[in-house]
Amino acid sequence: MLLEQMDDELDGAREYAQCALHLKDEDRELADVYASLARTELDHYQKLYNQMTRIMTNYRSEHGDMSHELQEFYDWQRTKTMNCMAEVKVLVDSYK
């Protein structure tokens, strides 16, 4: 559930950023709203990511290292979302 919500936040941020960029010359006020929403979605993503990190840290403290499969999945998911977040941040930051 948490991973799906993180993906949803990034997807929303990407969509809002694209709308902002598309509309910035046509309707600046609406574009500004979309840019603000994109930043808010990125903030939501960051809060969820912080919770995922907390959960994983607590798991390691209580149970020791994760299984190899779980660690691989965690690393893959982290890399995927970090790359996606970087892409979305570029979109958001390109809006001026």
What is the role of each PLM region?
Residues 1-96:
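Non-heme di-metal
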